[in-house]
């Protein structure tokens, strides 16, 4: 016994612990549920193509088909998840509640009820003006609400299919997410490297030149990459964590850190401000997910060191030119625009509280209250604050469901932590926080890919079923109904986008856009009867469709029903400023009636949307001579329209023929508190000078805020090379061979703007000049050189405009040699004076002292 014991002890001392045998990774699956390939294909397709947006309905249909196929092959999946109880069952209840709210919004209501709902005044007014009566759902946009209901299918399928997976196989869903994110990262880096013209954008996007990857929007790409960055740190997502030990685990950890580093580069490539702002959160969540499962001091040190290096890499990327370009956008106008959207959305919420306006109704509802001052070429497609948009469209019930969802997810996360799934709990919670952060300024969950990603993260938090869980009872009839409705809707939308509204209205007769576009085509073809009928069908579905109301009104007018058409046009005006043909019609009708004051708001709306600028500016110019027209224009200018400079430039063409009218308009602008600035009237002064009207030149100069005898004496309005030709009160650099004049900031301690004159020593003459209007008399010209300036000071001279005879101005310099002054005497009969810097052809004078300020005062 002793020998045997010693022999056994010896064997124990020399025994080498062997690693468990490597086996191919298996994906056990409960009986009756989908095989993993169906689920994997669906998740991959949804994440790869789900960033396409609403302009690709057939892609959305493909994703829905994949979801239905996966659910078809897993008829018992919902039952398996329901059987888990707790958080899993609560999430299913929340899905049902959200879908139920949408379904209730689609239930037709009697006229007295739906018209009495808050926020339905415009809809009721349009129906009254159009002569329409009958029942209507609570949603103002029932076709879009139905689309939102069908859009729940992919997230629901993702949640059910992943939640029904056994615990050890769930990480496969995260692995799909990380792989797709890496593909998007590589594509995004290639996109930003290739520039705006690179043929690497899979979808039409306004973010060309930026790394949008597999999305149409930079922020949505950044959101997916941040989620994947966190997920990559979960053990088992990158490499077979549970089947390896020691050195192999360290190798896997290094690969996971490298994957996260690549994803961080992709985030920077998006130039997303929100993405960069949430990058630290993603790093912390990934660090926590990796740290909670690290065993041994060496492994923990490797994890912390790697994540510290990753944080350093992110800092370097942020400080790179690409990162700085994104950071500069933090001080841009985007935040100001969003704040305006939020304020307007809050107004809409108050008007429709507590029931909301219906899911999908944001755009037409927002257009109905969008202020004139905020109009622009691009319309507002979302509130850019998803929580506000949910409140607007779903009302108080949506708020309660959303609050319950937050509480359920928080409880599920805590439950996952207590079950020993700390890494998954931290990663999933971190990913959901990233989406919540983006939802504060964007609408990520309205993109199919991110909705599916969110559903996967929630599914990872609920308890996993046992492998032998019952399959449940198939419910395939519902899947067929969903598939049929989705197919008809998406095919109908694709036909609309293809310019076939008649076919679309037959395939999906519940689509208002199909009937509206069909009515527009009929009106253009002269079929007024068909246009009236089909526009009416569009309004029956979507009563606040401004385009459909306008088409029906114009068709009525074309049929001789002037009163009915005008009445409907009046109701259409309350639906906003966004329908250009309606605005043009109302402007023309007001002008024909001699009501310039009524026409100007509609002209203003068109110009703000860059519609018909040249013709409308010409129309405005024709209104200036009439007192009522001028008053209406001044009133429009008080709203600071973007077309103001274009109008003043157009007015320059009339300045020579109607100088008094122009001067009177400028004076009225000043009295109204929106005075023209000197730079805005530069072209007017130039045209007056070309006509020899020097008195009006001075009058316009004073009316536009010109307080000095000389324009821009401190060069504050100048930057870069000066123009060779310019009008009065504007500095110019007359063309001289080998001479350049450039304005720029002073890099020295003095600050301010500086004017630099450089010569090759051969050119001579007036290198810098300005034309001004001066009354006869004596004037004092002051010249200040830049502090510490080196080089020749140059000579100054003046000449009566048109004479060509330059008379010198004797500049007396003070002791410091930087400040000097001289006098000039303007005789009678000199309508305008040219004052300028004279240089000689001395080769020794190549660098002239930079100018800091020029002044001109009467003695």
Per-region residue spans from a language model:
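Alpha-solenoid helical repeat scaffolds
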Residues: 516-517, 547-551, 580-586, 601, ...
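Extracellular and organelle-lumenal recognition/adhesion modules and their flexible linkers in secreted
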Residues: 11, 188, 611, 634, ...
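TM-adjacent membrane-interface loops and short helices in multi-pass inner/ER membrane proteins
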Residues: 105, 217, 339-380, 387, ...
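Canonical positions in the second alpha-helix
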Residues: 504, 537-538, 571-572, 605-606, ...
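Hydrophobic alpha-helical transmembrane segments in integral membrane proteins
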Residues: 320-334, 475-513
């Amino acid at each position: 016994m002793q020998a045997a014991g010693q022999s056994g002890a010896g064997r124990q001392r020399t025994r080498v612990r062997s690693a468990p045998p490597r086996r191919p990774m298996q994906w056990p699956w409960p009986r009756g549920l989908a095989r993993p390939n169906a689920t994997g294909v669906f998740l991959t397709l949804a994440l790869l193509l789900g960033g396409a947006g609403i302009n690709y309905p057939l892609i959305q249909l493909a994703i829905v088909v994949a979801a239905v196929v996966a659910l078809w092959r897993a008829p018992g999946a919902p039952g398996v998840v329901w059987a888990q109880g707790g958080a899993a069952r609560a999430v299913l209840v929340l899905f049902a509640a959200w879908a139920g709210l949408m379904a209730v919004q689609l239930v037709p209501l009697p006229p007295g009820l739906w018209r009495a709902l808050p926020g339905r005044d415009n809809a009721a007014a349009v129906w009254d003006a159009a002569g329409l009566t009958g029942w209507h759902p609570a949603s103002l946009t029932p076709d879009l609400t139905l689309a939102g209901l069908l859009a729940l299918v992919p997230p629901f399928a993702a949640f059910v299919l992943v939640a029904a997976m056994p615990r050890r196989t769930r990480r496969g869903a995260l692995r799909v997410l990380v792989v797709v994110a890496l593909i998007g990262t590589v594509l995004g880096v290639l996109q930003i490297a290739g520039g705006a013209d690179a043929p690497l954008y899979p979808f039409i996007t306004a973010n060309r030149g930026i790394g949008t990857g597999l999305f149409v929007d930079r922020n949505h790409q950044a959101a997916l990459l941040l989620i994947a960055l966190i997920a990559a740190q979960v053990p088992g997502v990158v490499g077979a964590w549970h089947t390896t030990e020691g050195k192999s685990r360290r190798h896997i950890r290094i690969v996971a850190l490298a994957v996260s580093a690549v994803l961080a580069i992709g985030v920077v490539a998006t130039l997303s401000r929100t993405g960069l702002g949430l990058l630290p959160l993603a790093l912390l969540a990934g660090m926590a997910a990796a740290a909670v499962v690290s065993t041994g001091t060496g492994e923990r040190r490797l994890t912390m060191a790697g994540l510290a290096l990753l944080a350093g890499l992110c800092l370097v990327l942020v400080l790179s030119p690409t990162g700085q370009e994104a950071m500069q956008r933090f001080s841009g106008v985007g935040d100001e625009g969003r704040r305006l959207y939020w304020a307007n959305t809050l107004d809409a919420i108050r008007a429709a509280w507590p029931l909301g306006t219906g899911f999908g109704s944001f755009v037409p509802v927002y257009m109905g209250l969008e202020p004139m001052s905020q109009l622009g070429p691009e319309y507002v497609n979302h509130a850019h604050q998803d929580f506000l948009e949910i409140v607007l469209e779903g009302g108080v019930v949506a708020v309660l469901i959303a609050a319950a969802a937050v509480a359920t997810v928080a409880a599920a996360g805590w439950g996952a932590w207590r079950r020993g799934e700390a890494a998954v709990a931290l990663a999933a919670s971190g990913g959901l926080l990233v989406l919540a952060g983006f939802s504060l300024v964007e609408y990520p969950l309205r993109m199919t890919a991110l909705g599916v990603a969110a559903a996967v993260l929630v599914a990872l938090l609920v308890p996993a079923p046992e492998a032998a869980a019952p399959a449940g009872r198939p419910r395939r009839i519902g899947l067929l109904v969903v598939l049929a409705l989705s197919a008809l809707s998406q095919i109908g939308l694709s036909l609309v986008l293809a310019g076939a509204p008649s076919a679309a209205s037959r395939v999906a007769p519940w689509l208002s856009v199909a009937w509206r576009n069909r009515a527009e085509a009929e009106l253009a073809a002269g079929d007024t009867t068909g246009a009236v009928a089909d526009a009416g069908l569009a309004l029956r579905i979507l009563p606040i469709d401004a385009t459909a109301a306008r088409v029906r009104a114009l068709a009525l007018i074309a049929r001789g029903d002037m009163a009915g058409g005008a009445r409907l046009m009046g109701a259409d005006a309350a639906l906003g400023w966004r329908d250009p043909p309606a605005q043009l019609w109302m402007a023309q009708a007001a002008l024909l009636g001699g009501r310039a004051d009524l026409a100007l708001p509609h002209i203003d709306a068109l110009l703000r949307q860059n519609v018909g600028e040249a013709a409308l500016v010409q129309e405005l110019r024709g209104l200036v001579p009439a007192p009522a027209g001028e008053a209406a224009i001044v009133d429009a200018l008080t709203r600071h329209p973007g077309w103001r400079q274009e109008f003043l430039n157009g007015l320059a063409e009339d300045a020579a023929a109607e100088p008094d009218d122009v001067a009177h308009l400028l004076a009225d602008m000043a009295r109204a508190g929106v005075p023209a600035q000197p730079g805005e009237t530069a072209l007017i002064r130039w045209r007056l000078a070309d006509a020899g009207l020097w008195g009006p030149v001075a009058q316009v100069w004073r009316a536009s805020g010109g307080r000095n005898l000389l324009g821009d004496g401190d060069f504050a309005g100048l930057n870069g090379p000066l123009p060779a030709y310019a009008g009065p009160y504007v500095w110019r650099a007359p063309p001289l061979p080998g001479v350049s004049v450039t304005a720029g900031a002073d890099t020295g301690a003095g600050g301010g703007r500086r004017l630099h004159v450089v010569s090759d020593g051969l050119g001579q003459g007036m290198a810098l000049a300005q034309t001004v209007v001066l009354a006869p008399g004596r004037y004092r010209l002051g010249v200040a050189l830049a502090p510490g300036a080196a080089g020749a000071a140059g000579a100054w001279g003046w000449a009566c405009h048109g004479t060509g005879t330059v008379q010198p101005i004797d500049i007396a310099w003070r002791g410091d040699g930087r400040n000097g002054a001289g006098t000039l005497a303007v005789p009678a009969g000199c309508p305008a004076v040219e004052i300028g810097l004279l240089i000689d052809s001395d080769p020794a004078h190549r660098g002239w002292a930079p100018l800091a300020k020029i002044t001109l005062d009467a003695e």
